[in-house]
Amino acid sequence: MNKKRLLPKASLGALFMLFGTALTACSNSDFQTNLTSLNQLREGVNQNTSLTQDKKAFVESLQKAFENNPEGTTKVLLDAWKFTLLDSKILESKDPSRFVKAFGSGKSNEDVEPNASVKGLRLDKRFEPSTANIINNVISLNEQKVEAFNIQYKSRTSFKVQVKLNAQGKYQKSQVQSYLQQIGLNDGDLKQESGTLSADLIFTYTVPESNLFSRKNFDTLMKKINFNTTLKIDMVGKDEIMKKILQSTTFTNNLSSQTFQDQSIDLLPYLLYSIL
């Protein structure tokens, strides 16, 4: 009677180890083949934690994923941006350790897109430095909260991302009095020595006139994923003083609503923050 030969235990162990390695390798490359969800990317990164430690290699992997599935990869990048601001509440209560790993040292909320700071509102691009300083001196940002983040994406030539922030500020009457005429207020508008201001800020990102999102926007040298947009910022006052400032003939055309071309957003930090 013929007996089947059994593999030695050592050979079985080696076979299982080889099989496990192959499975891990497949898992690591799965998201490059057909990236369709943020959870899929998280699973791939969990299988290979070194990916997020080498940003250049990570950008290269995402570039490969984009080549295989442009729309799916772009949606994942936008979902990560939304998750970071709306779900993880990076502007309200960021995780300091994750923030440094994702955005780098020396960065702050002013480097998050969008935000309600002077930099985030592009005040330096709207006004002369002296005017921007007036606004900065009048209104001191105290709190900002992401209230909505909506994504409509069909293709790189048809998309709309809209983010609504509520910003709370404060003022000191002694500081504001020097600028009453410039900002459209009079002495009777400020009935208290100090007070709060509130506004809704709506950031709308749409298709840019040039530099549509493509493979070349995955910058492996600078370790960035540059998503170019046209940006429109609208401000809506929520209290009487803020409404009057926005209705001022001096500022109404530039402060309440303005559009900016070629506004590039590096999506890599949001992706890292959402999966770390």
From Swiss-Prot:
Q: Does the keyword Transferase apply?
A: no
Database matches in InterPro entries = Lipoprotein_3
Give the location in the cell. Answer: Cell membrane
Residues with lipidation of kind N-palmitoyl cysteine: C26
What residue intervals traverse the membrane?
Answer: none
Question: According to its record, how does it sit in the membrane?
Answer: Lipid-anchor
GO cellular component terms attached to this protein's record: plasma membrane
Sorted keywords for this record are:
Cell membrane, Lipoprotein, Membrane, Palmitate, Signal
**Residues spanning the signal sequence:** 1-25
Please give the chief subcellular localization of this protein. membrane
| Family listed | Belongs to the MG439/MG440 family.
Q: What is this protein called?
A: Uncharacterized lipoprotein MG440 homolog 3
| Source organism of this protein record | Mycoplasma pneumoniae (strain ATCC 29342 / M129 / Subtype 1)
